[in-house]
């Protein structure tokens, strides 16, 4: 692939790690963020110590205070910002773009009020004449591992297979490999909803439960994620792939996962406000829990784990009582869809 100029919107942990992958592949990377000190640090010290204490970035990776400068002449734009600000940032990008670009995103969540997926937000806010079909970059990936070039395999999903193949070629190298998929609904819902289950898995750990319980919440969590996704039009096969069970395993079992760590703290009795303050990073699973619960109610989809986590986070329900209620639900067949 010829050298591409890629604007990376969001200098968080994942945006930074993906920037390094793109740079390793010989592409020109332009990061944009709105924290002046962070942008200056990337340019001057070639570090992003807010997320990576010991990592030195290549000097060719540049960061910009100006969104217009970051977008100037870009071949592709990669959104890696928190879900709750995606619409606002997309509006700003749309106002500046003056040519057609490939548009990708690597965020995982549902918009709090509308319950919309991120690709839908981008489609609504960026006119079609300025962009390709949206490509979703998602899968089992800790930024802490990708930044040190550990092997990572994820998915590039788009309604346009050629757009997905472009992103596959853009990112793939000897340690970072992408597979294409055209099931955007499946890939996005898997990536968003697994954060809820990771909060629950962390909570079980914080409460002192063992591996049996953790395996149970991951597998039954995958079942209810699949139920909601299929109701929205996804293929059930997607949930057995990298963006489904793969991402759920890595997020639901690892201390690297901020959602798992948040759940662990909840299980140990910490208050949510304190957890969010101490984390210093967005915990997508918290806001996604509310959106998914409301969506499940609207579509009449059975999601007992999501409902339990919602009650604990948003209604102050006792976490041990929530577990008791799940364990005493009516008996079900394992593959029941309701």
From Swiss-Prot:
GO BP annotations listed: carbohydrate metabolic process; glycerol-3-phosphate biosynthetic process; glycerol-3-phosphate catabolic process; glycerophospholipid metabolic process; phospholipid biosynthetic process
GO cellular component assignments: cytosol
Pathway it works in: Membrane lipid metabolism; glycerophospholipid metabolism
Organism expressing this protein natively: Streptococcus gordonii (strain Challis / ATCC 35105 / BCRC 15272 / CH1 / DL1 / V288)
Amino acids binding NADPH: 13-14, 108, 143, 258, 282, 284
Name the record gives this protein: Glycerol-3-phosphate dehydrogenase [NAD(P)+]
Function: Catalyzes the reduction of the glycolytic intermediate dihydroxyacetone phosphate (DHAP) to sn-glycerol 3-phosphate (G3P), the key precursor for phospholipid synthesis.
Subcellular location: Cytoplasm
Family membership noted in the UniProt record: Belongs to the NAD-dependent glycerol-3-phosphate dehydrogenase family.
Gene name linked to the record: gpsA
């Amino acid at each position: 692939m010829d050298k591409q100029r890629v604007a990376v919107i969001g200098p968080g942990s994942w945006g930074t790690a993906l920037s390094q992958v793109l740079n390793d592949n010989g592409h020109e990377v332009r990061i944009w963020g709105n924290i002046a000190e962070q942008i200056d640090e990337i340019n001057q010290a070639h570090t992003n110590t807010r997320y990576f204490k010991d990592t030195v970035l290549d000097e060719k990776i540049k960061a910009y205070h100006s969104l217009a400068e970051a977008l100037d002449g870009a071949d592709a734009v990669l959104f890696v910002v928190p879900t709750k600000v995606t619409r606002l940032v997309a509006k700003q990008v749309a106002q500046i773009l003056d040519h057609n670009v490939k548009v990708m995103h690597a965020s995982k969540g549902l918009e709090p009020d509308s319950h919309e997926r991120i690709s839908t937000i981008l489609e609504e806010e960026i006119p079609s004449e300025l962009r390709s079909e949206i490509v979703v970059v998602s899968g089992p990936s800790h930024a802490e591992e990708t930044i040190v070039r550990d092997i990572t395999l994820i998915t590039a999903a788009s309604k346009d297979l050629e757009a997905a193949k472009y992103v596959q070629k853009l990112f793939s190298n000897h340690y970072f490999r992408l597979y294409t998929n055209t099931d955007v609904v499946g890939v996005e819902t898997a990536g968003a909803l697994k954060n809820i289950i990771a909060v629950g898995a962390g909570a079980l750990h914080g409460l002192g439960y063992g591996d049996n319980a953790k395996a149970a919440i991951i597998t039954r969590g995958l079942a209810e994620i699949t139920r909601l996704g299929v109701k929205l039009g996804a293929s059930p096969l997607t949930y057995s792939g990298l963006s489904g069970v793969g991402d759920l395993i890595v997020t639901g079992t690892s201390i690297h996962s901020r959602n798992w760590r948040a759940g662990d703290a909840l299980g140990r009795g910490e208050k949510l406000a304190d957890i969010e303050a101490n984390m210093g990073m967005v915990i997508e699973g918290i806001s996604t829990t509310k959106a998914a619960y409301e969506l499940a109610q609207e579509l009449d989809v059975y999601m007992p784990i999501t409902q339990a986590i919602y009650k604990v986070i948003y209604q102050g329900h006792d976490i041990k009582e929530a577990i008791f209620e799940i364990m005493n639900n009516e008996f079900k067949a394992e593959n029941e869809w309701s």
